[in-house]
C-alpha cells in the first residue's frame, strides 16, 4: 500500500481509511487564505456500506489501496450470488450480492455472456464497473395515447432484465435502446 496526499485524491479512488476499505464518492478541494487548503471527501465503506464525510488538510496523507481490475464474463445469477468466469483461467467463481457495494443496483444492468470489469482487493471483489451506456431490448411498453404530444412526453418501458425506465413515446416493444448505467435513464435508441 502506498500513501497519497489528500490533495491528490480523486473521485473513484480506493482508500484504506480507519482500517477499512473505502471508495471516494465525492471530492471537493478548497483553497483557504494564507496558502492552506482543505479537502472534503464523501467516502463509502466497502464492507458495511456506510457513507461518511471527512475533511482533511491538504498536507494530510492517507493510504491508497492497491486494487486489481479483472475482466470476467458474467454467466448467471444464482439466488444471492452472481456467477462469473475468469477469462484467463476459465475458473468460475461467485460474488455474493451483499458483499459488494451497490451491486444490487447493478444487477439489472448485467447481461449473460457479457464481459465486465471486477475490482479486486486481494482475493475479494469490492466493486463492479459497468459501461457508461448499456443496450437493452424493450419487452413491454405502455401504449402511447394520441394527443400525448407535450414536449418530452415519456412512458414506462420494461427491458429484458426487468429494469423499468422512462422512454420517449416512439419506443415500442422489440426496439433496442441505450440506458445510462449511472442515472438509469434512457439515453438513445440503437440504430439498426
Curated annotation (Swiss-Prot):
CDD domains: S1_EF-P_repeat_1, S1_EF-P_repeat_2. It comes from the Bacteria. It is found in: Cytoplasm. Pathway: Protein biosynthesis; polypeptide chain elongation. SUPFAM superfamilies: Nucleic acid-binding proteins, Translation proteins SH3-like domain. InterPro entries: Elong-fact-P_C (IPR015365), NA-bd_OB-fold (IPR012340), Rib_uL2_dom2 (IPR014722), Transl_elong_fac_P/YeiP (IPR020599), Transl_elong_KOW-like (IPR013185), Transl_elong_P/YeiP_cen (IPR001059), Transl_elongation_fac_P (IPR011768), Translation_prot_SH3-like_sf (IPR008991). Transmembrane segments: none annotated. Keywords: Cytoplasm, Elongation factor, Protein biosynthesis. Its main location: cytoplasm. GO terms for biological process: peptide biosynthetic process. GO terms for cellular component: cytoplasm. GO terms for molecular function: translation elongation factor activity. PANTHER family: ELONGATION FACTOR P (PTHR30053), TRANSLATION ELONGATION FACTOR KOW-LIKE DOMAIN-CONTAINING PROTEIN (PTHR30053:SF14). Belongs to the elongation factor P family. Involved in peptide bond synthesis. Stimulates efficient translation and peptide-bond synthesis on native or reconstituted 70S ribosomes in vitro. Probably functions indirectly by altering the affinity of the ribosome for aminoacyl-tRNA, thus increasing their reactivity as acceptors for peptidyl transferase. This is Elongation factor P. It comes from Borrelia recurrentis (strain A1). The gene is efp.
Amino acid at each position: 500500500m502506498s500513501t497519497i496526499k489528500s490533495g491528490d485524491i480523486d473521485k473513484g479512488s480506493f482508500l484504506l481509511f480507519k482500517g477499512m476499505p473505502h471508495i471516494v464518492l465525492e471530492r471537493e478541494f478548497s483553497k483557504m487564505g494564507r496558502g492552506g487548503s482543505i479537502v472534503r471527501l464523501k467516502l463509502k465503506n466497502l464492507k458495511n456500506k456506510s457513507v461518511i464525510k471527512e475533511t482533511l488538510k491538504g498536507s494530510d496523507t492517507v493510504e491508497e489501496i492497491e486494487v486489481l481490475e479483472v475482466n470476467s464474463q458474467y454467466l448467471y445469477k444464482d439466488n444471492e450470488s452472481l456467477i462469473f468466469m475468469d477469462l484467463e483461467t476459465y475458473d468460475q467463481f461467485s460474488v455474493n450480492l451483499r458483499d459488494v457495494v451497490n451491486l444490487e443496483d447493478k444487477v439489472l444492468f448485467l447481461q449473460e455472456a457479457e464481459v465486465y470489469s471486477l475490482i479486486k482487493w486481494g482475493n475479494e471483489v469490492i466493486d463492479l464497473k459497468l459501461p457508461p451506456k448499456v443496450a437493452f431490448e424493450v419487452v413491454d411498453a405502455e401504449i402511447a395515447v394520441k394527443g400525448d404530444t407535450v414536449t418530452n412526453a415519456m412512458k414506462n418501458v420494461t427491458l429484458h432484465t426487468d429494469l423499468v425506465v422512462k422512454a420517449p413515446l416512439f419506443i415500442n416493444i422489440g426496439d433496442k435502446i441505450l440506458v445510462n448505467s449511472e442515472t438509469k435513464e434512457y439515453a438513445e435508441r440503437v440504430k439498426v
